[in-house]
A protein has these predicted regions:
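Acidic metal-coordinating catalytic centers involved in nucleic-acid phosphodiester chemistry
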Residues: 1-8, 12, 63-148
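Catalytic centers of nucleases
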Residues: 8-88
């Protein structure tokens, strides 16, 4: 039971740090951040969200502006890694039927149908396994998933 309590507490602290790190940008008049929120947004990517000014928004890996970023924070108390199989297993996110990858797809269709303007990010203290095939699909510069 104490392991579960520690995981919950540490996970909440991790999410809060991400939120406040983004929210602090609101104090900088030169920051592209215009709004920050938490616990709202597309299911599975609702821990923290950030809205950016269109004229100062960060660009995606293809140079297009990202107007909104949805972040899912995944904290683990144990040291480990993850891989492609975890992204399609609902149990990995403590769900019954829908995996993180399915939730990412649903969020993309609902919030950025053409694939532009929104980013859906998984932030975790685990790394992708050294030998996992998923590693080869990650752009090392932008840390994005290459689908082509």
């Amino acid at each position: 039971m104490t392991q579960a309590v520690a995981a919950r507490r540490d996970g909440d602290a991790f999410q809060a740090r991400i939120f406040w790190r983004k929210a602090a940008c609101l104090l900088d008049p030169k920051s592209p951040v215009t709004q920050v929120g938490f616990e709202s947004g597309p299911k599975g990517f609702d821990d923290v969200w950030v809205a950016y000014a269109p004229d100062r928004a960060p660009n995606d890996h293809e140079g297009r502006p990202i107007l909104r970023e949805h972040i899912q924070c995944k904290w683990h108390v144990s040291v480990n890694d993850f891989g492609h199989a975890d992204l399609i297993e609902p149990e990995w996110i403590n769900a019954n039927r829908i995996s993180l990858l399915q939730r990412a797809r649903a969020a993309q269709v609902a919030h950025a149908r053409d694939g532009f303007g929104a980013r859906f990010k998984l932030l975790t203290n685990w790394r992708i396994g050294q030998t996992d095939p998923l590693r080869g699909y990650i752009n090392q510069k932008s840390k994005t998933l290459r689908l082509k």
